[in-house]
């Protein structure tokens, strides 16, 4: 359901953003 999708986004998005920020700093 949508709740599972939101849960995945809420946990995965911060990690993805921090990873992108690290990659862009290099």
From Swiss-Prot:
Record-level GO cellular component terms: extracellular region; other organism cell membrane; pore complex
Places the protein is found: Secreted; Target cell membrane
Taxonomic classification: Eukaryota, Metazoa, Ecdysozoa, Arthropoda, Hexapoda
Protein name (database record): Melittin
Site (Important for the flexibility at the center of the helix, flexibility that is important for the stability of the voltage-gated pore): 14
TM ranges: none
Domain of life: Eukaryota
Subcellular location, principal: secreted
InterPro entries per record: Melittin/Api_allergen
Keywords: Amidation, Antimicrobial, Cytolysis, Formylation, Hemolysis, Ion transport, Membrane, Porin, Secreted, Target cell membrane, Target membrane, Toxin, Transmembrane, Transport
Tissue: Expressed by the venom gland.
